[in-house]
Amino acid sequence: MALSRGTSLILHEDPEKIPSPNSCEVPGIMSNTTPRPTPDLALAPPPEHALALTPALHPALSPDPEGVSGPVSNDIPSHNASGATTPSSTQINTVDTADQGLNHTSGPDAAGTLCPDSQPARIPSSTQANVLSPENSSRPCSEDVSKSFSSKVFGLGQSNSNPSRPEPNLYIKALSREALVRSHNISRQGSQVPLLLPSNTSLDRLHSGNISKVNLGIAPNSNEAITLTSHTIFASISKEALSAPWNTGSKGSINGTSTIQPRSGLNVTVTHASHVSMIPGSSEGLSLQSSARVPNSTLSPSSCMTLIMDSESPSMDSSFLVTDTSTLTLSSHRDYSEDNSIRTMPLEENLGKWDSLQGVTALQSPPEGTSEDVKVNEAEKRNHDNKAALVANIITYQKNQEMVEMKEEKEATVKMMMRQIQEEPLDSLLSPARRQAMEILAQLSHTKPILSVRERVELVNTCVRSVFSLPSVQAMQEKDESKAEVIQILYYQTLDSLQKLLNALFIEDPTPTGLKSILEPLGPWMNSGKAHERARAVNSNVSVLNHTLVTLPFLISSGFPTLGLLLGRLLLRIGDPDEEIGREALDGITILYTILDLQKRTKNKEDTNKKELYENNKRFLGPYNPVSPCQNILRVIAEFGDFLGPQQVRDLLLAALEGLKGISETQGKDSGEMMQLASEVMLSSVLEWYRHRALEVIPEIMQGIYMQLTHIQEPRAREVALLPISFLASSFMTEVVVALLMCPLPLDSNGAEMWRQLILRKPSCDVRDLLDLLLTSLKEKPVTKKGRASIVPLAAASGLCELLSVNSCVGRVRRIYPQLLLALLIQVHYHIGLNLPSRMAPRKDSKDDTQPPLFIPVRWMVKVVKTLLLKMGCSYESAFLEEQGGWELMGQAESHYRGVSLLARAMVHYSCQELCRILYLLIPLLERGDERHKITATAFFVELFRMEQVRRIPEEYSLGRMVEGLSHRDPIMNVLSIRGLVILACKSEKMAKVQSLLPSMVKSLKNMDGMLVVEAVHDLKRIFKGQGKKLTDSAVYVEMLQILLPHFTDAREMVRASCINVYGKVVKKLQTPRTQAMEEQLTSTLMPLLFIIQEGNAKVSQKCVKTLVCCSSFMNWELPKKAYSQKPWDNQQLTVTKICKYLVSSHRDNVFTFLNQSLEYAKNSRASLRKSSVIFIGSLVPCMENMMTEERLNEVKATLEILRHDPEASVCICAAQAQDQIMATCWRNSWPLLYGDSWVCDPSSMHRWSPSCENLPTSHQRRSWIMQALASWKMSLKQ
């Protein structure tokens, strides 16, 4: 314990006085003293700075290279040169410093004073350190609060009892307030011997630690006074008040806990105390004073306690904790005080707050010249439960604080040692630093708290890598022949230190989890390509197993940790080219078998001798056979059957695969063949005898094989690694296929080889059953019920593609070819736009600077369809789709049905042999599934109507299904139904029935996309041609014209041209006499045709001219000849005026219809139509004369005003021109001024200047209308 945080102080007892028989020394590495569970404790503070390579963790744990080797008992006092012993008064000294150094044990000098110049005690060096065994390691108890270690050493300062005087050593004072240490005197009555350090101690001594041991039990006299002077003291005095060990608190203070009954004359004086805590265990009185000038106090009554606090400065706090007293008087004063005051408060009121250390009463020292007294009165009787709870809470709090500090200190030390080990070179061994660090770590393993699993694994990994990565001892000796002997000794010492560390870590946590954290890091090293690394790993594993067998502290109910991996790796080493490694590996397996057997016998409550059991098992497993080690492997696998569960079988197989990695690179040909043989024997025997136990771990085995194949390059080794697939598939094909479906997509070479292994190697599975499983997977939706994407269908398609690459499988695939084809086509539709979970397989052949191609599921599915067609001999069909772009159409959402139709049409054209099977298979499919399923099936089914065999199908399955499709809510189903009916109409016996359905077919085209309308109308033309003039009801034609007219303005050129062309052909089908419906429909077509002619698209314009001629011919219109001209109207104002005058004069009843259509086209998204409509409006309105109303004129005004700000400049100019024409016509015809209309101005005001240009007509503003239009257009562009 320390007087301040960071001090390194141990209190030693005086050998000449009455020693305490229960004192407990600090156990050292070579200490012969066994610690006993007594309250006497060795004290050391937590570290605050980084430790050196060999830090002064603890006087007993610090290897001292300069000290004399050999065990030292702490019970023997140190002597000086003259042989004088320490006097009755001992001394406690602490001085803080910011540096570290070596720790020495201070002995008394000739004058009887302990000083740093004394001869240091003998401490064992690091080279002679022994690992602490469980029998001699210290254990924490309720009073033990100092199990931590420290590397901090302290310098010495002069005593200064007067607070007003300056410090003689300013440097030490500047270190920290808590580092200023006063003199500590323990004196007897009548014999006051001060134990002070020399005042002239230099700063060089700051690097040495002074350790002395004092026992307060040296005062048998009842009148003895104990005086302690310190800057910060935390004293805890319990029921027994004489022999007290001292411990550091959580804040670097001192706790004193008495161990025997108090004497009647005991006086305790504490001066310069900042924190005082007293916990009496009985009602016996205690008196505690803190004053620099007050003499020894007398014993107070049991009902009261007096505490006088004297601070060194006005800012220092004084706090205390007292229990089991009825009256508490507190006084805090300073010398030269001018005012004193006393305060009293009952303790019972604050007992609830005293449940933690937060309840400590703190007195702030008043300024100089003032004093304050406080009296606290407590009830005579206190509740015993409250007292017990208070004491328990305080002890618990102190323990928690100490545990936290110890944990942090241990973690910091472990990390520092690990860094030191990591800094050691991996190619040479010239320093004992690595060994010393591991020895320190081994010693730390005996302290609490224990390391976590993650920390232990990290520690073992660091140490193992640092030692195992070293070259062989022969190589290191050859590199430095002059130090060959030293290197050899240091090498074996390092290996021994590592093994002791591993054993110590197991002792620290002797549980299955703790054993697993040690064995796991060792495992991969047994498969190293270097013999010396394998030998070290095998030796360490065997040593840990041997230590486990000797200790065996636990009963493994869930099986030995990592049994499968450990057994598998040791089995591989039996076949190692180095016979010594094989022999030691077999011995390790024998120990492992003995452990398992012993656990089994212990569970059955059978008494067994470990040594005899080991010898019997050694004979039972047989001697090592270097000629044929595979015999040993087979024997071991057979005998371990009772201990192998599913997890162990999995680990055995994966361990066998580990032995196949890197054979060609790291080992010779013979060695590689031996390892392959050992792995193959292991795999074959385990799968032959225990494959039924691997059923539940098949997915994990498949995943392990996939991962290991990436590291196995040698062809023969890859064949061995793939053996478990064919073995397991022969018995559990469904489970194996399901596991293979989880391989990352797209399949790389490893995944593809695993699929092909199902049928390439014996024993192989039934291909028929395998294909049926894949077909079942292909029928699943790639989206689960919860909306999550599933890779199962795509994985099944990928597996099918790999199986098709095996020629022997093609014949079996033909059996279910129709089902596979339809299932794949439906999956193509499902995978359009589908984002699957990211399970991309890393491409080992891809370069770092090249991005792998983006994996799009639908394209991969289309590729599988193409592969299936080619394997089934449909190369012509595949080429046809390639030419027509059918594969691209098939992978798009809006055109998927077109790609499927192209494929079916090609198969019909090239007379595919499987069409009849597909036709009969499709009939039930039309009633199943969702919309995508039905669309794909219907698209294929409709094209099969071209076959002659369709006549055999009942009419309800052909014509009936198509009639139902006409009323389907999906437009694509409507189009497909129309196509099916048109194809059926080619059959003479079906023509009449299909023609009767023409009105329903036309009606189904309403509200349909333009492209679908064009496609459907293209099919309907066949019926119109075949019908001729037989159709007497013109309503069908009129309805067709109504459906086509809205698509005249479609954004797609092909749709516009097709609809306009069909419109003209339908008009030709019309017969006289004209009905009102016909006239209204054709009249509503006039303006659109005139505007579209001005579009500027030659192809569309030509279709419009033809259609306009057809309409004019049927309606007897006499339009001006230039109305059919495609020349722009920009410079043809007279032509537009003639057309408008003709329309007003000849179609007076429809003039407002024409105006409304013009205003509607003025809002069209295409600029060409807006410009044509504006030009037409500018000529039509003046021709209407008095027909215009105010409401209509305002509507025209608003439309033109908006168009003056159109993004298209030509539209702005045309809008301004139209305004000028309309205004000029109004003034010329002397239109009356409309009320409240500022747009039409008085002609008389046109010749006067008005500052408000906004109210003037456009033609009378200072700028011309062209400039105004251009300015408006520019403003609109800026916006």
UniProtKB/Swiss-Prot annotation:
One of its GO terms (cellular component) is membrane. The modification Phosphoserine is found at S356. It holds the Pfam family HEAT_MROH2B_C. HEAT repeats lie at residues 913-950, 992-1029, 1035-1072, 1080-1117. The chain crosses the membrane at residues 548-568, 722-742. Keywords: Glycoprotein, Membrane, Phosphoprotein, Repeat, Transmembrane, Transmembrane helix. It is a multi-pass membrane protein. Its main location: membrane. Signal peptide: none annotated. Residues 71-106, 124-140 have a biased composition (Polar residues). Gene3D superfamilies: Leucine-rich Repeat Variant. InterPro entries: ARM-like, ARM-type_fold, HEAT_Maestro, HEAT_MROH2B-like, Maestro-like_HEAT, Maestro_heat-like_prot. Residues 39-61 have a biased composition (Low complexity). The keyword Membrane applies. This is Maestro heat-like repeat-containing protein family member 7. It comes from Mus musculus. The gene is Mroh7.
